[in-house]
């Protein structure tokens, strides 16, 4: 099935973002991105069509396979565009945790990593932030999952190692704060961004 695309280039005047707050973003596999405010976007576009894609592949329907892949690509791009646009419109600074996606693509998590679209989302956030005149930072996300965003400790109760990947909620054994795994990481990423900006360190 042939596909035709009509592209129109227009010049628009970028409007500065009216936002005053900063947010941290944790990139993940279960959710493509989790914001320090608690907002999340699921990134399972491929998974939604995996069954239909498998049927088409086994039946050797090449046109159907191409059509499904095109649909997945368009849904991913549209979802990430909407998510990134809303963030940039409302915030004054966006801090993203650095993820070694190139390494994960070579592991058994490759399919989920590619489906999440981290690189695409980061690129969208970066150029949209630049257009809106807001701060965009990428920070080292080491220990952001294990560190309690409330008291700053790395308690024994925090998720660690491969076994910790299954833990979605945990309680800090030091201050008794209950954490959503990804929201906690996003809050720590935001804190790391504040420290970098306060020290005048440039973007990674």
Specify the residue positions occupied by each region the protein language model found.
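Positively charged, helix-rich recognition surfaces that bind polyanionic ligands
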Residues: 1-204
